[in-house]
């Protein structure tokens, strides 16, 4: 997924951590999903199901990237504008089958 500026190994790490913590879905959104990111842009993720808090902590600590993560819990109420952004520009990175 190099067009997002995120190395494939980091995507794999995110997916592995989603499985580990029972997360059902992880969506990339924001500048990295749109392709208009800068080199140091953070990685915006929206996640649902499972232990989102532990997933978020692990993603920050255990992935092999110096980039910062901003993780939105889709199981909680979020503003309409953010919902629209996730819906329109989101790219599914992981979905439990």
What are these regions (language model features)?
Residues 1-25, 33-39, 48-97:
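Catalytic core of pol beta-like nucleotidyltransferases
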